[in-house]
Amino acid sequence: LVDAGVSDKKELMSNPKFAELLKGFGVEPPLKISTTTDKETFAFAKSDEGFKALLNHDNEKVQSLVAARLGTKSTLEETRTQRFIDIARRGLLPVPVRYYAAHTGRWGGDDKINLQNLPSRGPNGKKLKSSIVAPEGYSLIDCDSSQIEARVLAWLAGQDDLTNAFAKGDDVYKHMASSIYNVPSDGVSKDQRFVGKTTILGAGYGMGAPKFQAQLQTFGFDMELDEARRIIDIYRSTNGAISQLWRDANNMVQYMARGDSVQFGKDGVLQVDARKNAIMLPSGLPMFYHGLAAEKSDRGYEYTYRTRKGPNRIYGGKVVENVCQAIARCIIGHQMILLAKKYKAVLTVHDSIITCVRDEELDEAQAYMEECMSQTPDWAEGLPITCESGTGKSYGECE
């Protein structure tokens, strides 16, 4: 580390500085397409294949540098573990939650206890989750809304064949793989189904071939760019209504910026209030794009809106993603209200709700919870909702 010029851990934690350290040893930093910005960024996550490969680099100094970076990052996990230990000494685990943490209204962690991103992979995998246990005589139920964003997307776009497949309980990942590889659904291999799953869950918001290729690589699945491009083309041609929704949303951004109020989505279910720069969701929740403005660029006009972190670019696919996540959030909230008639939610993580019940009520409570989380709100008629649940004495056992 001294040879590399590392003086403190800040140089290891900073992506640009760490990239310069690698270049000092003649190593080009691995890159990926950011799923947040759609731009090229450093692939320095411990799950990134290019980064993991550096642990076996021919130069031992590069190996040491990468190991030190991973060790520094692991201190964050150590800090959270210590926080759990300190809380356990005081009694029960509080679950502080920010009610509207993201632009789409998703809940978020607070008070230095972020239960939204507990690790589930790696050497310490589920240890933190398994440390969250029910009191004596109680059990936990973890119920997850299955594929909720993909279902919302199909319903919102009026992609009726996909919506009907979800409603019938078909394996839509196999169906997608069947179209991609031109094989019968019952002949789809495990790897082919994985590609079908990644396509259904990833390509629905306008993802391009380079980003799709990069996403597969993060799972250790190598694919040529031409093949990734072929798969994206098949997804878009197979799901024409979804592709049209992106275009409609892109036009909507332009209309909103001009001050024109319009409708889009299935049967005009999304109402645009241009005076407030807001999209009114069918649940009644407004989603704002404050300070929406057009900027001239080499590619024409680009649109941005104001956030606490500065201007954020917005376009058709991103609008659709925002709307689907916000609608999914509203559905989870609706389900929590139904559940609260009999049982209290003790935690919500992404698309799942966790409750704590007496052991003698476990089967009844699990059945009631699945019933609540399979109900579609009145404002989302025709949207097929389903769920999966697990039980255990600890949060980790529920999965």
Where are these regions (language model features)?
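Helix-rich, typically C-terminal accessory recognition domains appended to large enzymatic cores
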Residues: 211-212, 332-333, 387
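Catalytic palm subdomain of template-directed nucleic-acid polymerases
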Residues: 153, 211-223, 236, 240, ...
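Extended amphipathic alpha-helical segments enriched in small hydrophobics
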Residues: 199-216
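A general structural motif at alpha-helix termini
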Residues: 16, 22, 216, 232-235
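Short, positively charged loop/turn segments that connect secondary-structure elements
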Residues: 185, 221-231
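Acidic, glycine-rich two-metal-ion catalytic cores of nucleic acid-processing enzymes
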Residues: 8-187, 245-352, 359-360, 366-372
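Polymerase palm active-site segment centered on the conserved acidic dipeptide of motif C
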Residues: 1-11, 227, 231-258, 360-399
